[in-house]
């Protein structure tokens, strides 16, 4: 399913920021800075993009995403090849923002995949929209963490521009969740309802509390933490968002399959009706010959 493959690829590109942030804050340089998790997340992004390529022709949209991701990785790699003391805070900030840009380049792909899905069954628009909104929410959640990583790396409270970007991102998360949460809590599917509760518990309450507490520490001049330690603590809180997104995608696929089966049943019934009409005509023809 193209929609799921593109959502997965966009999520992998977004999730790659976690180990990237940790690596940028690590004292090691060169190959030592690129631990197994860092390498595995890059491979996962590449594999997900390859899966999209195999599904169908996405043309320039896929190429643009891959080029943007490659450019962002080059910025990251240039910094990782230097000792940590030589990684200028502004350069770290630019590298993280370049990774933001890589995710943004996935939007045309998502538009194309969603349009194709709805062409198959327009009634799936509700579930498809929620799944996409959850992808956006997962990315915004990760950006909140990345904004704090920038301040941690610079060992100073967020500057006004950084604070504004943080608050804007936080606002988007808080705007999305009531819309998504209402859809999850009112679902007839127990898996979606339970996954929604997990997001409320693990991220809205737990993850946001950790983010707000970390921001307060930075504002108070407490820099006794590292990008790696903060990333290690915050990333598990994002898992619930991904699971809820997957639950909606699974439901969308089931509805699509059910719709196709319904269409196949309708086709069979139509064929039987045609055969019955032909049989009646044949019987009438034979009866007419006998008269």
What are these regions (language model features)?
Residues 1-291:
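Hydrophobic alpha-helical segments
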């Amino acid at each position: 399913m193209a929609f799921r493959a593109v959502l997965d690829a966009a999520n992998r590109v977004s999730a790659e920021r976690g180990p990237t942030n940790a690596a940028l804050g690590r004292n090691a340089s060169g190959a030592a800075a690129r631990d197994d998790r860092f390498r595995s997340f890059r491979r996962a992004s590449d594999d997900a993009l390859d899966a999209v390529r195999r599904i169908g022709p996405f043309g320039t949209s896929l190429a643009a995403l891959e080029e943007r991701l490659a450019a962002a990785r080059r910025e990251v790699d240039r910094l990782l090849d230097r000792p940590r003391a030589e990684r200028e805070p502004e350069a770290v900030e630019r590298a993280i923002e370049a990774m933001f840009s890589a995710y943004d380049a996935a939007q045309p792909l998502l538009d194309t995949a969603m349009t194709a899905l709805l062409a198959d069954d327009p009634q799936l628009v509700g579930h498809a929209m929620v799944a996409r909104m959850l992808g956006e929410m997962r990315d915004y959640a990760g950006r909140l963490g990345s904004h704090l990583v920038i301040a941690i790396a610079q060992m100073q409270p967020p500057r006004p521009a950084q604070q504004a970007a943080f608050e804007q991102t936080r606002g988007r998360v808080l705007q999305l969740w009531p819309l998504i949460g209402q859809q999850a809590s009112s679902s007839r599917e127990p898996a979606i309802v339970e996954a929604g509760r997990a997001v409320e518990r693990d991220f809205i309450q737990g993850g946001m509390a950790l983010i707000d507490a970390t921001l307060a520490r930075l504002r108070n001049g407490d820099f006794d933490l590292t990008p790696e330690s903060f990333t290690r603590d915050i990333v598990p809180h994002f898992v619930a968002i991904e699971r809820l997104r997957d639950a909606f995608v699974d439901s969308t696929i089931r509805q699509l399959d059910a719709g196709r089966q319904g269409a196949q049943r309708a086709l069979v019934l139509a064929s039987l009706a045609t055969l019955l009409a032909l049989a009646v005509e044949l019987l009438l023809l034979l009866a007419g010959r006998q008269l």
